[in-house]
Amino acid sequence: MKILAAICCLIFAVQSQNFPQEETNHDTIGVGGVNWFAYPFIFFTPETDWAFGAGGILYFNLSDQLKSKPSNITASGYYTVNKQFDLTVLPEIYLNQDKFLLSTKFNYSEIYDFFYGIGSTSPDIANNQYFQRNFILNVKFQAEALKKNFKLGPIYELRSMDVLNKEGNPLLDSNEVLGSNGGITSGLGFIASYDTRDNIFYPSNGGFHQFSITYYSKALGSDFDYSKYLLDSRTYLSLFPNHILAYQAYIMIEFGYPPFYELALLGGDKVMRGYLYGRYRDRIYYAFQAEYRLPIIWRFGFVVFGGLGDVASKVSKIEISTIKPSYGFGVRFRIDELQKLDLRVDVGFGRDTNGIYFSVNQAF
């Protein structure tokens, strides 16, 4: 298992409103007002050695309505002294008075990753690493349909993954794992969402419920034929002034023949915090988590969270005894009072594991 040798730390952060919107009356937000926030970071792990990077968010309104959702572009990247690098850009653009939503994901990386096998009880292995080159491009376009706050539309997902060095990983060296040499996945599908949140950065009321189906096929240029079903349901309750209870159910199911790197991956900085992302993987991934958010002093806030989740090969193989806990706490710093945009640091714990996460925006 990956051991974190020195935690990610904040050196300094900068915030700008260099592109102020023109003065308007108090019930509108001017089109074109652009704000941004950026932060550098440094961390060390045995796999990466020293790594230096930066992240940030650019956010703006493309509508002149007061309650319109802000479009935003988040980005992060790092480079290590042993020549690994990772760059991710996530634009989310609201158009035509929020009636259209274009969200994309771009990622390019050459990094060490980990593979411990497939299943809920996959054991630790000595040589768990491999070196990969990865390119991801996901595009989702949704249009308002049937009623306000309900959107649906198409999805396209493309991924090219090359296993450049198996690093003696016995599971990949056996060539018995589907996708052990990498490959291309190309999928087309649709997505439907119902979003009643009162704020996309820090919801205090409402919910976000999303369902998607994506089909990957050789007819679309994919090396693998499979399908993916994803349900993400979040609810937000204001218990007291500025005290928020948020909870989420997350379910992913795959059919067909997905490669090992496209299986449902447990862990990471959003769901099941405390576990290395992908430490456990399979065709089914289900998780439930809750988080309590409250203010402390000035712009600082505090959260506690807990959850349960696991992976399985099929529904009949789900075992209560292998369900894994996730719990922890975090600190928030409000970088924009108007939009309720936070910088977050979370410390998560799992079963014999832990993780530290640093980002902009809430985990969910």
Predicted regions and their residues:
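Gram-negative/organellar outer-membrane beta-barrel architecture
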Residues: 27-38, 43-184, 266, 281, ...
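C-terminal outer-membrane beta-barrel translocator/porin domains of Gram-negative envelope proteins
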Residues: 188-193, 197-296, 305
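Short glycine-rich beta-strand segments
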Residues: 107-111, 159-161, 212-218, 252-254, ...
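Bacterial Sec-dependent N-terminal signal peptides
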Residues: 1-23
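Transmembrane beta-barrel architecture of outer membranes
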Residues: 49-53, 72, 84-88, 134-138, ...
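C-terminal hydrophobic structural anchor segments
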Residues: 293-326
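Short loop/turn motifs that connect adjacent beta-strands in outer-membrane beta-barrel proteins
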Residues: 22-34, 62-70, 96-101, 146-149, ...
